[in-house]
């Protein structure tokens, strides 16, 4: 084929391959200027940057590239192709035979032709890192997509990194207060931990993540990184403008901005969606290694798995359960293990996790469970009652709900709330068949309290003010505990259920009860 054109391309021709490459150059000495390590006589010939290959096959997002003998790029290296004036990055995924690599494209492959040149960069995909990324949106390969000019950073970093060593990791237990009652009371988040928001389609995962960005990122003062993985472009756009309006970011980035955004949305090819979480994580890791406490938001981790499964089939791997890739647990582990707190700084990660068909046993959400410190499960049955956030108080868990961490009072109130709600759940079948009248007096009281607790777990959000018309509320942890303690003890048995719906603290519920009484009079 076109192999004769550049039989032994030198790495000196890295930026612009010369048309007349020396025909008889010795291949073993081919090295990149940036990689002197490869000059050692025992080093693999494959480590040569600047090697030129030619495309032999394009199947959707998967592209095969043939290289001259002895110049095979390493696995995970980035190759660059000029696709009609547009820089297309391919990531090496497999070695086929002695001279061909199978790669995953990070953008659309329309316009590629067989025989086209592909240049080995000699390193993995590199993204810009540092304070210059704050207030900006970039894509999976670190290119700006917010039309605010290039991102001029002092450093770049490879998106594939090893997880921190055991000796570097920190294990202190501290709570991250969110101002959301149901979360802070029943499944509190760990500072420097991993939090998963589980839910089916349309139960409020993205709204909850936006509220957390609003409450925590503003109060937190440190830097935040948001990775939009395979979700709606409209929501990504809304978030960008909302951050500017609320003062978290400045238009066009620069001083005063607190959050970096990395997007690879629904319309992107699977290669971009499978790697954009790593690009975002790389930006967050850089802040952590500089001693910052970083918040890392991912919406949606399921799309990372989904993209991996799309690519896996194209790479010719035999699928495992439910059609997922056989490397599901490995892919997830490689990413999740990097999200950790070290002795230098911390990463607190909040991840929205879509649950296909509301089935928590599906391999994708089930694999994510193992990595999390706290899980917030959003339930459709609660959303149907109009209770938002639709957090399931019995399904949501946290390792922080421990008297040694949260204190005896908080722990006792949380467990009491759960036991009342559990009893109500057990009685629901009896109520449905026989009605309330058949219950004992004690059970009637439990049901009445449970219904009030259920409504008091709802809360108006700042980010949903536009839809609900009611101003958002941020509730202090002490007020949350006080309110639920009183509800469990029966201090508010005389108030109507409606008084507890969509309010912040218990004082607001008392005010609302007075209003309702005045209206009824």
UniProtKB/Swiss-Prot annotation:
Its main location: membrane. One of its GO terms (molecular function) is ATP binding. Residues 1-42 are annotated as: Disordered. It is an enzyme of class 7 (translocase). It catalyses: ATP + H2O + 4 H(+)(in) = ADP + phosphate + 5 H(+)(out). The keyword Nucleotide-binding applies. Keywords: ATP synthesis, ATP-binding, Cell inner membrane, Cell membrane, CF(1), Hydrogen ion transport, Ion transport, Membrane, Nucleotide-binding, Translocase, Transport. It is a peripheral membrane protein. InterPro entries: AAA+_ATPase, ATP-synt_VA_C, ATP_synth_F1_bsu, ATPase_a/bsu_AS, ATPase_alpha/beta_chains, ATPase_F1/V1/A1_a/bsu_N, ATPase_F1/V1/A1_a/bsu_N_sf, ATPase_F1/V1/A1_a/bsu_nucl-bd. Its EC number is 7.1.2.2. Produces ATP from ADP in the presence of a proton gradient across the membrane. The catalytic sites are hosted primarily by the beta subunits. F-type ATPases have 2 components, CF(1) - the catalytic core - and CF(0) - the membrane proton channel. CF(1) has five subunits: alpha(3), beta(3), gamma(1), delta(1), epsilon(1). CF(0) has three main subunits: a(1), b(2) and c(9-12). The alpha and beta chains form an alternating ring which encloses part of the gamma chain. CF(1) is attached to CF(0) by a central stalk formed by the gamma and epsilon chains, while a peripheral stalk is formed by the delta and b chains. This is ATP synthase subunit beta. It comes from Brucella canis (strain ATCC 23365 / NCTC 10854 / RM-666).
